[in-house]
C-alpha cells in the first residue's frame, strides 16, 4: 500500500470496500478493493488468490482492468483502473437515456459479456451498479469472477442477493442455469437504460419474484421495432428460447457497435457458451494467453464434482465515485476494429423463428391462478403494472425516439430512486443509502472513542474495533460470508442454482468470528442506561444500530446477549417521554434500514437450531441433505433460551403491527429463511398440558398474531400462512383446546381470517372435531372475549356449504 495514496472511500458492499487512490510513481488514479480475510477458510483464500490471477489475465477495453493484487495479514487488496460513475447513479441523476446513447452503451456491454463468455466466465451479477462509465460514456463491466463469495454450505440469502431485479427466471424458479442467465440480466439493464426503470419493480421481494417468474414485460411505446425485438430476445423467460450469441452479434440493434478482438474469435469457437457446437477440449487453446487463462481456470480447486471450467459472480460492491473525480480516458470506440463474428453463417437474419417473436402483450394465466400472488386459495383483482396495457399494444411498431423534457426527466429520476429496491439486501445487511454517510461515521468514531476513555470496562473489542475499521455496511459481514452457494454447485454440469423458497442459510461456525460475550453484555448494559437517561442519539444513527444488531448474526452469541439486544432495541417503545415521540419515527426508520426484523428472526433460528458441524465438516462438499439444519423442540430448550426467543419475537411482533415496511420485511424473511419450520416447531407443541412454559405460550401467541397480521394487511402473501396452518403436522384443534386463553383467542381470529382469504384451505381441514371445538368455546367458555371471538368465527364459517360436513 505504500505505493498508493488513498484519497477517499467511493464504494462498499458485501465483499469489502472500494477506495479511490493515486499511484505515487505516475499519479495514475486507481480503485483499490479491500477484501477482509476474516472468517475465511484456507481453501477459500487459496481460490480467491487464483481468481485474482485469472482476472489479471483478462484484457478487454470494456472490462475493468485489474492492475495488481497483494495482501496483508488481515486483508486482500485488488487494484483496478478507476471509472467515473456507474450506470445506476447516472440513471438516477439523468433519467432514461435516448435510444441512441443506450444502443451505444449496450454495444459496449455486449462486447464485454461476449469476451467473458468466450473465456467461459459467467458474471451472474449483472446490474447497473456493476456497469461503470467514463466521461465519454464508455461502459466497462466490473465485479465478476473475483467477486464470487467462496463460502460453502449456503443457499437461500445468496440467491436473492441485493435484489432479484436483474435475476433470470430460471434462477428464481430453481432451475439449472447457464450463460443465458447473463443474457436476461443484460436485457434488464438495456431496458432500464431506455425505460428509466427495470422491467419488473415491486416493494416486496416475494412480489417481485412472482412478477419475474409469471408476468409479461410491459413495453414502452417509445421503443423502435429494432430495439423491442432486441429486448424481447433477451427477456424471453424460457432460457431455451432466449436469443443466442450467434443471433445477438448480428442483431441490427447492436450491429456495428461491438468490439471483438481478432484473437478472441478462436477462443469463442471453443467456448460452449458462445458456440453451441463446441466440445470441451483438454488441450490448450492455440493462442498462448488464452491457453494460460484456461490453465489457470483448470487449476481452481472446486471439488471432485467439477465438470466445467467457469467462474461466476455474486458480488454487490457498488464502486460509486463522487462527482468530483477526475475524468478517465478510455477512447476505444474510435479505433474499433472490424467485427469478426465466429460461425456467422448462422446469421440472425436467417432464423425466421426469432424474427417471429410475438409483439403482443399476452399474460399467461389460467382460471385457478391468482395474478398477484399465485395462490389458488385467493381471489384478488388484477393489478396494473408500470406501463399502460393499451399503450403497449398500440406502440408495438412505433419507431419514434423518446423526447423527455428536463423536468420530466428529473421527476422520473426521483421516481426511479423511490421504486428501486435496496441493492444491498445482502443477507439483511445495513443499507446506508446510495452515498457514504461520512458525518455518521465521524460521530460513531467520536462516540466510540469517548466511551473508551470514560469507561473502565471498554465496549466489546469485536464490535468497536471492527466497526471503526470498516464502513457500517460491512458490520454484517459474518452473515454475508456464509450466504453463497457452494463452489461445487457452480461448477457442476447442470449448474443447479441455489434453492430459493424455502431454504436454510447454513451459517457454519467458521463464518461467526469469536465474540466476547461478557464485554458485549457490559456494553449493552451501559447502552441501556444511556437510553434510560434520555440519550437516544445512538438509536438514530444507522452505523451505531448496526453495531448493536451485529450479535444477532453470530452463532457464538449466548442467549443473554441476544436477549439484551432485543431489550435495548425495545426500550424506545416503552419509555414514556413527550420528547421521545418526536424521535420515535427516526428510530423506526433506522430499524427498517438495518433490516432489524429479519435479523431478529435469523437470530432466533440460529438460537433454536442444533449446533452446526465442525469447521472441517462445514468446509467439505455438501449434499442436499446436509443443507437443512434441524430445529430443537420446546422440551429440548432451556428456560433461558425460551425467554430469549420470546423477547426476540415479541419485538418482531410489535414492529410488524407498527409499520407495514416491517411487515413486508417479515414476509420476505419467512420465505427466505424458511421460518415456517420454526413456526411449526412451536405451534405443534401440545399446549393442552398444564406444564407449558409461560415463555413458550407467549412465543406461540406472537406467531399466531403475526400470521393474522399478514392475512389482514398483505393477503397476497397468504400462501406463507397456508404453508404453516395447513401443514399435516399441525393439528389446529389442539390450539383451540389449549389451556391458555391467549392461544385459543388468537387461533379463533386466525381461523376467521383464513376463511376470508384462504377459503379452500379451510375447507380442506374442516371437520366435525374442529366445528365442535369452536362451538364449545362459543357456548360454554367463561372468558367473554374468547367466547365472542369463537361465536363470530362460527357465524362467518356457517355461511359456507362445507360447514355441516
Swiss-Prot record:
Its EC number is 2.7.11.1. Residues 269-289, 447-496 are annotated as: Disordered. SMART domains: S_TKc. Keywords: ATP-binding, Developmental protein, Kinase, Nucleotide-binding, Phosphoprotein, Segmentation polarity protein, Serine/threonine-protein kinase, Transferase. It is an enzyme of class 2 (transferase). Expressed in all imaginal disks, higher level in wing disk. InterPro entries: Kinase-like_dom_sf (IPR011009), Prot_kinase_dom (IPR000719), Protein_kinase_ATP_BS (IPR017441), Ser/Thr_kinase_AS (IPR008271). One of its GO terms (molecular function) is protein homodimerization activity. The keyword Nucleotide-binding applies. GO terms for biological process: germarium-derived egg chamber formation; intraciliary transport; negative regulation of BMP signaling pathway; negative regulation of smoothened signaling pathway; positive regulation of nucleocytoplasmic transport; positive regulation of protein ubiquitination; segment polarity determination; smoothened signaling pathway. SUPFAM superfamilies: Protein kinase-like (PK-like). The keyword ATP-binding applies. The active site is at 125 (proton acceptor). Residues 278-287, 447-456 have a biased composition (Basic and acidic residues). Residues 4-254 form the Protein kinase domain. It comes from the Eukaryota. ATP binds at residues 10-18, 33. PANTHER family: PROTEIN KINASE RELATED, SERINE_THREONINE-PROTEIN KINASE 36. Belongs to the protein kinase superfamily. Ser/Thr protein kinase family. Probable serine/threonine-protein kinase; maternally required for correct patterning in the posterior part of each embryonic metamere. May be involved in control of cell division during metamorphosis and ovarian development. May interact with costal-2. This is Serine/threonine-protein kinase fused. The gene is fu.
